[in-house]
Design a protein with these regions (language model features):
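Membrane-interfacial terminal anchoring regions of lipid-handling membrane enzymes
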Residues: 12-34, 43-246
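Structural motif
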Residues: 3, 35-37
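Glycine- and acidic
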Residues: 6-7, 39-41
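Conserved nucleotide-cofactor-binding alpha/beta core module
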Residues: 1-13
Length: 246
């Protein structure tokens, strides 16, 4: 395991990033496996996007400025982890309202601890874990037109496509999207009983939201935030499928 240092300033940021990247390159060359998140922090709306800045950091440990060549020795393999239920969903919705209503709002270390504990130990329902194709294979297959030299943005997009294409979607995902659209596009993959259960679940999560004195939960806003969290994986996967067919 290794520590990603945050809240650094100026030149310290570059030095820490280079040191971490060099460590990762050395570890991979020694035959070790490393796991790293695709972005800093958590996606609040379940739209998973790889940060190009992360790929730039990973490339710092190589002896070339060519992004593709710099990342090649790391043997990057995208991994998709799908939860039926996100135990932190109400905390994310709560944070969205606080950011909307409280100028300059920032989470405290205690908030981070609650989020981490809830994310680890909270109930997730069914969980799917899919190991995708290596980045080198995604590049060589040419499923998407690529211009050389590859930019970190193009590489991030390839990683995202592989992750999104292997999402496991659950009834709650389709139901959330249909509730937002007001049309039952995906009725064939869920039942009225499923829909009733999801509606009850969403309302129960809103009840868990706790705001500072003087603020009232905006139930409609919170409801939409929660529905979007569960709908976005469907949209991301559909977008990837459409791009693949094009």
């Amino acid at each position: 395991s290794f520590l990603v240092r945050r809240n650094l300033q100026g030149r310290e940021v570059l030095l820490a990033a280079r040191l971490l990247s060099e460590y990762m390159h050395d570890a991979i060359q020694e035959g070790k496996s490393l796991w790293i998140a695709q972005r800093e922090g958590r996606s609040k709306d379940s739209t998973d996007k790889t940060q190009p800045a992360l790929l730039k950091m990973l490339a710092l440990g190589a002896q070339t400025k060519d992004s593709e060549q710099a990342l090649s020795p790391l043997n990057i393999v995208p991994v998709t982890c799908s939860y039926e239920y996100d135990p932190c969903d109400y905390l994310k919705a709560q944070e969205m309202q606080l950011k909307r209503d409280v100028e300059g709002f920032k989470k405290s270390p205690a908030d981070d601890g609650i989020n981490m504990r809830t994310g680890i130990f909270g109930w997730k329902g069914e969980v799917s874990f899919h190991i995708g194709r290596p980045l080198s294979e995604l590049i060589s297959l040419g499923e998407v037109p690529l211009e050389r030299p590859l930019t970190v943005e193009a590489i991030a997009s390839l990683i995202d496509r592989e992750i999104h294409s292997h999402y496991k979607l659950f009834p709650i995902n389709y139901i959330a999207l249909d509730l937002i659209d007001g049309v039952e596009h995906h009725y064939g993959v869920y039942t009225e009983e499923d829909k009733s259960r999801v509606l009850q679940y969403i309302e129960s999560r809103i009840e868990l939201v706790r705001l500072p004195e003087g603020l009232e939960p905006d139930r409609e806003f919170l409801r939409r935030c929660l529905l979007m969290m569960y709908a976005n994986p469907v949209l991301s996967k559909l977008k990837t499928e459409l791009e693949t067919r094009a």
